[in-house]
Structure formats: structure tokens, C-alpha cells
Swiss-Prot record:
<dbReference type="GO" id="GO:0007034">
    <property type="term" value="P:vacuolar transport"/>
</dbReference>
<keyword id="KW-1133">Transmembrane helix</keyword>
<dbReference type="GO" id="GO:0003729">
    <property type="term" value="F:mRNA binding"/>
</dbReference>
<feature type="transmembrane region" description="Helical">
    <location>
        <begin position="99"/>
        <end position="119"/>
    </location>
</feature>
<dbReference type="GO" id="GO:0000329">
    <property type="term" value="C:fungal-type vacuole membrane"/>
</dbReference>
<dbReference type="InterPro" id="IPR051572">
    <property type="entry name" value="VTC_Complex_Subunit"/>
</dbReference>
<keyword id="KW-0143">Chaperone</keyword>
<feature type="transmembrane region" description="Helical">
    <location>
        <begin position="33"/>
        <end position="53"/>
    </location>
</feature>
<feature type="transmembrane region" description="Helical">
    <location>
        <begin position="60"/>
        <end position="80"/>
    </location>
</feature>
<feature type="modified residue" description="N-acetylserine">
    <location>
        <position position="2"/>
    </location>
</feature>
<keyword id="KW-0812">Transmembrane</keyword>
<keyword id="KW-0007">Acetylation</keyword>
<keyword id="KW-0963">Cytoplasm</keyword>
<protein>
    <recommendedName>
        <fullName>Vacuolar transporter chaperone complex subunit 1</fullName>
    </recommendedName>
</protein>
<comment type="similarity">
    <text>Belongs to the VTC1 family.</text>
</comment>
<keyword id="KW-0926">Vacuole</keyword>
<dbReference type="GO" id="GO:0016237">
    <property type="term" value="P:microautophagy"/>
</dbReference>
Length: 129
């Protein structure tokens, strides 16, 4: 009989078991991607509306919003594929992204500020009392 206590850890082999990635992880990544695309379609719709029914300033703003929407679509696609590959490789890294939403907010803020500045400057030039 062994003299070692029963509950004591003994140095032994580690058994390598394949870890299973739950399907809900892939679906969550896909839902996030579709949410980003939903936002970009709305932003692109705003750009098209400004382009069709706006004046010269509206066309400038439409271009800005359309470029922000297209950039966001590309960002969402790259992020989706990066996360999907990391999930397939069972990467342990963080999957959150602080840079993308921050840049999106910054570019939207710039587009809105440019729209306001052009609108105020254009209206002040045409409405002299």
C-alpha cells in the first residue's frame, strides 16, 4: 500500500482534451456584424436622402456620411473575419475593440460639425438683412 495520502496531488500527465467552441459564440459574432451593417445601411440611407433632396451643402454632407458608412462597413467586415478566425483557432485574446467605435464616433462628430459649419456659413451669406 502507498504511503501518500489519497487527496495529495501527484505530478502526472495532463490529458489533452479538445475544447469545443460553442456555436453561440459564432452566432454572437455574426449578430454583431449584422448590427454594424444595420447601422451602416441607416447611415448610408441618410447620405442618399441628403444627396437626393438636399442643396449643395446637403450633397457635401451626403458625401461625408456615405464615406463614413462605407468605412464602417469595411471595418465591420474586417473585424468579423478577424474574430471568426480567432474563434476557430480558439484564441484566448480579448475580442473587444475600443478603437473602432471610438473612431466611428469621431468621424460622425466631424461630419456633423462640418455640416453645421457649412449650413451656418451658407445661411449667413445668403440672408443678409
Amino acid at each position: 500500500m502507498s504511503s501518500a495520502p489519497l487527496l495529495q496531488r501527484t505530478p502526472g500527465k495532463k490529458i489533452a482534451l479538445p475544447t469545443r467552441v460553442e456555436p453561440k459564440v459564432f452566432f454572437a459574432n455574426e449578430r454583431t456584424f449584422l448590427s454594424w451593417l444595420n447601422f451602416t445601411v441607416m447611415l448610408g440611407g441618410l447620405g442618399v436622402g441628403l444627396l437626393n433632396f438636399g442643396d449643395k451643402i446637403g450633397r457635401v454632407s451626403a458625401g461625408l456620411f456615405t464615406f463614413v458608412a462605407m468605412g464602417t462597413m469595411i471595418y465591420a467586415l474586417v473585424t468579423y473575419h478577424w474574430r471568426a478566425a480567432a474563434i476557430r483557432r480558439r484564441g484566448s485574446g480579448p475580442y473587444d475593440d475600443r478603437l473602432g467605435p471610438t473612431l466611428l464616433c469621431f468621424f460622425l462628430l466631424v461630419a456633423v460639425i462640418i455640416n453645421f459649419i457649412l449650413r451656418l456659413k451658407y445661411n449667413d451669406a445668403n440672408t443678409k438683412l
